[in-house]
Amino acid sequence: MTPRRHGELVVTGVVGRDVDMAAAREAAGLAADNAVTALVEAVGLAGIDRVVKMTVFIAAVEGFTAHSAVADGASAVLRERLGARGAVARSAVGVRTLPSGAPVEVELVAAVTQPS
């Protein structure tokens, strides 16, 4: 998921050039919130057993090294929305570009119980 509200990216660009750290962390949080919302829509909140892994992709300038600090914004949202079920193994990966010029993208792998 990317940092969108009502289908529109709220920020675009490259972290360290167009997007500062505060905006990047906020964008990561919004992307994580969107990912959790998609899970809830699919299986309901009670259907989420736990998030197994989160990967945060960050479009950043060459030489950028604060990937984990950006990903902290996403981790905070998982803890806020899911509590202990959101305590997760995490990777933060720097990339050259992301879809539609997004500065971050969050991918979740979750263990779920299908609704009956």
Predicted regions and their residues:
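Short, polar/acidic, helix-capping and beta-turn segments at strand->helix junctions
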Residues: M1-S116
